[in-house]
Amino acid sequence: MKVITACAVLNEGRHGPESRINTAWKDPNYYRLPTDLGHKWEETMTVREAVVHSSNIVFGKLGYDLGPTLLASYMSAFGLGKLTGIELPGEERGILPNPKDWDQLKWSRAPIGQGVSVTAIQMAAAYAAIGNGGTLLRPYIVDRIVQADGTVVFQHKPEVVGQPVTPSVARNVLDMMVGVTQKGGTARRAAVRGYSVAGKTGTAQIPAKGTYSNNDYNASFIGVVPASNPEIVVLVTYHHPFYCRTKKTSEAMGVPIYNHQGGLCAAPTFRDIASVVLRYLQVAPDLPDEVPDEFPDEDEEEDR
């Protein structure tokens, strides 16, 4: 949701990648903004830095400034709240509430993914649109059917659904997302040797009894690779990831320290899957072989 919000503010000309946003979460001009717990920021942060660090405060403010109608229109333009039309039974629309029903609390939280619900295929299609220069295509399962003698009896033809943002905005947002997988970002573990990766972490609280749980999460990472000339999108989600956050609990349970955040749970799995798919598709590397084999310990890296 933060990436779609970034697309919206850039496409509307409200901000650029280097525009600086005040990070005071008790700003009197905003209503109950979600804090960046456990993180110490400078007084301001650029939109680019907000993507890299996954700032709840900045995106809460950006969404609030866009307003509910405009924010919801971009979410809808990216295919949220709609059936994608993929050739699978039982597809769900997700939940994209009517913006007329959004109060200040809801529309300041929608940019961080609260109050809305999306399916994996919707999110994959939205990120593919960013990789496709802002063009949203209908996802599909079967690319072609070939007979034993080599005759092609069916070939899928790409179907354009819409153009939610301009190619230049899509490129700018993709470039910002590359920082997520680099040093200082929330998902260094998603880096694929030899390839640039543009991605975003997700750490979503699971609703429980009318509110959001502080113990149950969906941890995810979605990436577009190679970022310089996108070929694939991979989305990995862990539902209810087991986590043990302290050394004391770890020793008592006899298990290693785990973390429920997308940058630690899902990012490494993304890296493993993307590495195999890129080789299978024979996609040429776009970066020197610079990605290290070893990644930082949990307490040395920022994850959200």
Task: List the predicted regions and their residue ranges.
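Beta-lactam-recognizing serine transpeptidase/beta-lactamase-like catalytic domain environment
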Residues: I4-K247, G262, A266, F295-D297, ...
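Short amphipathic alpha-helical signal-transduction/dimerization elements
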Residues: G131, T181, R271-L278, Q282
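A solvent-exposed, charged loop/short amphipathic helix patch at secondary-structure junctions
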Residues: T246-H260
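Flexible, small/polar- and glycine-enriched "cap/hinge" segments at structural transition points
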Residues: C265-D272, V276, L287
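Gram-negative outer-membrane assembly/targeting C-terminal domains
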Residues: L278-R304
